Curated annotation (Swiss-Prot):
One GO BP annotation of this record: translation
Alphabetized SUPFAM superfamilies for the sequence: Ribosomal protein S2 (SSF52313)
Gene Ontology MF terms in the entry: structural constituent of ribosome
Keyword Ribosomal protein: yes
Pfam families: Ribosomal_S2
HAMAP family, alphabetized: Ribosomal_uS2_B
The name this protein goes by in its record: Small ribosomal subunit protein uS2
Keyword field: Ribonucleoprotein, Ribosomal protein
Entry's Gene Ontology cellular component terms: cytosolic small ribosomal subunit
Family (UniProt): Belongs to the universal ribosomal protein uS2 family.
Domain of life, source organism: Bacteria
Length: 245
């Protein structure tokens, strides 16, 4: 199993938290100190927690489980989509729609509509419509693809969520908690770790840090899938106990 090391995290700026006045006391035990009124995250605590999360994800992937990537803020979206696609994982990179997990039946109907429109666009149906109707359907297709394109092949609820910026994605975490879906999350010094089963204390804004998290997670999924033939399947019910306190 490949692991992230301290040098990788330092180069990516994982240790830089938020301004001290915005800190969340629940993250106090992961803070090393402050520099120029910026909290510094204790990477000696982050390192084993990050690697534990990667090991968990690799085991899930080995058991053919689905890990959904969630990162909808501007600095994360593109990286989330790229790495999820590389790992063949579902993702949400634009906006979390309320009920995406807890009302999946309705979401599935919207995914069917998206697939129908994709078929119509490809088979020439749009060309047979009036300009106005074709434009309306094209806009519907674009809107649905933007919202649901990353999960259209998911085929059911995910077995775990990996979240960048737990405050920004609090609705997703709440839905996962209600359904008993494990949550892995990058938690910065201004955020609450509540509802996160596998906490990764770290910078959730810097692009290089986000790239490190996403690339490492995608690599773990790919490794797990490649080891399916020689390993024992591991299911979500057998996951380790939550790390959150």
């Amino acid at each position: 199993m490949s692991q992230v090391n301290m040098r990788d995290m330092l180069k990516a700026g994982v240790h830089f938290g938020h301004q001290t006045r915005y800190w969340n006391p629940k993250m106090g035990k992961y803070i090393f100190g402050a520099r120029n009124k910026i909290h510094i995250i204790n990477l000696e605590k982050t390192l084993p927690m990050f690697n534990d999360a990667l090991a968990f994800v690799e085991r899930l992937a080995q058991g053919k489980n689905k890990i959904m990537f969630v990162g909808t803020k501007r600095s994360a979206g593109k990286i989330v989509a790229e790495q999820a696609a590389r790992a063949g994982s579902p993702y949400v990179d634009h906006r979390w729609l309320g009920g995406m997990l807890t009302n999946y039946k309705t979401i599935r109907a919207s995914i069917k509509r998206l697939r129908d429109l994709e078929t119509q666009a490809e088979d020439g149906t749009f060309a047979k419509l009036t300009k106005k109707e074709a434009l309306m359907r094209s806009r519907d297709l674009e809107k649905l693809d933007r919202s649901l394109g990353g999960i259209k092949d998911m085929g059911g609820l995910p077995d775990a969520l990996f979240v960048i910026d737990v405050d920004h994605e609090r609705i997703a975490i709440t839905e996962a908690n209600k359904l008993g879906i494990p949550v892995i999350g990058v938690v910065d010094t201004n955020s609450s770790p509540e509802g996160v089963d596998y906490i990764i204390p770290g910078n959730d804004d810097a692009i290089r840090a986000i790239e490190l998290y996403m690339t490492s997670m995608a690599d773990a999924i790919i490794r797990g899938r490649n080891n399916v033939a020689g390993g024992t399947e591991v299911y979500v019910e057998e996951a380790a106990a939550p790390a959150a306190e």
